[in-house]
């Protein structure tokens, strides 16, 4: 875990190093021409090994995939966000004391599964992972247009189907978006207990205006809005969640989320923000509140409009570039926000090797 002041100091040093360097950043394709291009554009990550105090788990990936003693992390694999996913994985491995005890469950569309798995193996040769196919037809007919096209991607809804996509032997998982980096030991997040019958845990933001996540049509319909009558719902970001998959399956929460999507699609427009509102409708007011340090979100701002964001006060364990702006896009354009320099040391794109080259100088901080 890093304090806000420590991250600020690190940020100043990174910025100083980069601004005085002799190199220039070449123009980079955001979307590679092929998956082979994506693989060749990425460097192999350093090898990370368990510390002496780590439990010895199965070396066989098939066995580790079902081992409840392992830390299980689920992420989507979207070619457009592959660079972000790779950086997120890199940050997790770098900051955990037991990297060999982590198993990654990646979800990809059927057309890209094999190529993406090959890319991951080349970047992380010793990584324990499995790539699952998400059939986009499962949810495509339930998606209604939102305020941002990126939110309409079927893969964005895969988080609602983890209990069905992942092997039934997986009873608990951490779900992470692709635009995060972890600067603390992920085992701390994994060990958080979900009290009572709660199915998910996430940082909760009760100061946010909860009503804005739904339309006037929703709030004026007593039958629909009564879902919150016995609760005190608060906003939470679905980009970082600890999920009890056994409780999820028992509660059949995927169907409950789908039911709200059907109302949105077939009856009346009750929300505008893609996959988030159905989660709020089903779980709002009934989640395990996790410390805010595990999702310093909303840092994306905008790639085009100058709207850089700053870290929130307090300790930081996970930094999340949610929103339109992504650090790799701004860095490539030569117009980064200061916060983007905290993402850069985990970037494994070959054009960014300078950040990795100087990263050792930052270890003393």
UniProtKB/Swiss-Prot annotation:
<feature type="topological domain" description="Lumenal">
    <location>
        <begin position="32"/>
        <end position="365"/>
    </location>
</feature>
<keyword id="KW-0808">Transferase</keyword>
<protein>
    <recommendedName>
        <fullName>Probable galacturonosyltransferase-like 10</fullName>
        <ecNumber>2.4.1.-</ecNumber>
    </recommendedName>
</protein>
<keyword id="KW-0325">Glycoprotein</keyword>
<dbReference type="Pfam" id="PF01501">
    <property type="entry name" value="Glyco_transf_8"/>
</dbReference>
<keyword id="KW-0328">Glycosyltransferase</keyword>
<comment type="similarity">
    <text>Belongs to the glycosyltransferase 8 family.</text>
</comment>
<feature type="glycosylation site" description="N-linked (GlcNAc...) asparagine">
    <location>
        <position position="209"/>
    </location>
</feature>
<keyword id="KW-0735">Signal-anchor</keyword>
<keyword id="KW-0472">Membrane</keyword>
<dbReference type="GO" id="GO:0006979">
    <property type="term" value="P:response to oxidative stress"/>
</dbReference>
<comment type="pathway">
    <text>Glycan metabolism; pectin biosynthesis.</text>
</comment>
<feature type="topological domain" description="Cytoplasmic">
    <location>
        <begin position="1"/>
        <end position="10"/>
    </location>
</feature>
<keyword id="KW-0961">Cell wall biogenesis/degradation</keyword>
<keyword id="KW-1133">Transmembrane helix</keyword>
<feature type="transmembrane region" description="Helical; Signal-anchor for type II membrane protein">
    <location>
        <begin position="11"/>
        <end position="31"/>
    </location>
</feature>
<keyword id="KW-0333">Golgi apparatus</keyword>
<dbReference type="GO" id="GO:0047262">
    <property type="term" value="F:polygalacturonate 4-alpha-galacturonosyltransferase activity"/>
</dbReference>
<dbReference type="InterPro" id="IPR002495">
    <property type="entry name" value="Glyco_trans_8"/>
</dbReference>
<dbReference type="GO" id="GO:0045489">
    <property type="term" value="P:pectin biosynthetic process"/>
</dbReference>
<comment type="function">
    <text>May be involved in pectin and/or xylans biosynthesis in cell walls.</text>
</comment>
<dbReference type="GO" id="GO:0071555">
    <property type="term" value="P:cell wall organization"/>
</dbReference>
<dbReference type="InterPro" id="IPR050748">
    <property type="entry name" value="Glycosyltrans_8_dom-fam"/>
</dbReference>
<dbReference type="GO" id="GO:0000139">
    <property type="term" value="C:Golgi membrane"/>
</dbReference>
<dbReference type="InterPro" id="IPR029044">
    <property type="entry name" value="Nucleotide-diphossugar_trans"/>
</dbReference>
<keyword id="KW-0812">Transmembrane</keyword>
